[in-house]
Amino acid sequence: MILEDTADFLAALPSMRSLMGLDLGTQTIGVAVSDTFLSVATPLETVKRRKFTLDAARLSDIVAQRRLGGLVLGLPRNMDGSEGPRCQSTRAFARNLDKSIGSDLPITFWDERLSTVAAERALLEADTSRKRRAEVIDHVAAAYILQGALDRIRVIRAEQDQE
């Protein structure tokens, strides 16, 4: 089930389940996971894109193995905030993945503008070699996307606790 609003997404999440963050590219999918308390995102792996059915099967395996409670997909908005063809492609991927997984797994989107730039900068600061950066950039970017969503979830929970 695809939910646009983060608060609705949070309400639909099962308790004590981790989330998976995805950074969709044309050739790869960066994958990151959170802890069960939804506080920290960790890069997991980069999936080499082939056919959708194979990609969906791999992501479905990760969801099942880790008993994940929801998915956060990076939404590649234009710098002015508008949605272009890449956003449409991401939304189509989410719809197809939702059908493919065939469960009531909540799916939401998170603005991924500059996530790859931030990931690249962090890897440069960590003095990572060019070869290693190329290997890990996608799942590190997925962790940045997921961490942004987790930070928003923390704010929503704090606001709910004050009410």
Curated annotation (Swiss-Prot):
GO MF, any single term: nuclease activity
Name this protein carries in UniProt: Putative pre-16S rRNA nuclease
Biological function: Could be a nuclease involved in processing of the 5'-end of pre-16S rRNA.
Keywords for the protein's UniProt record, in alphabetical order: Cytoplasm, Hydrolase, Nuclease, Ribosome biogenesis
Major localization class: cytoplasm
Source species of the chain: Roseobacter denitrificans (strain ATCC 33942 / OCh 114) (Erythrobacter sp. (strain OCh 114))
Pfam families (alphabetical): RuvX
Upper taxonomic lineage: Bacteria, Pseudomonadati, Pseudomonadota, Alphaproteobacteria, Rhodobacterales
A GO CC annotation given for this chain: cytosol
EC category: hydrolase
Localization (cell): Cytoplasm
UniProt-listed InterPro entries: RNaseH-like_sf, YqgF, YqgF/RNaseH-like_dom, YqgF/RNaseH-like_dom_sf
Domain of life: Bacteria
Entry's family note: Belongs to the YqgF nuclease family.
Record-linked Gene3D superfamilies: YqgF/RNase H-like domain
SUPFAM superfamilies: Ribonuclease H-like
Enzyme Commission number(s) of this protein: 3.1.-.-
BP GO terms, sorted: rRNA 5'-end processing
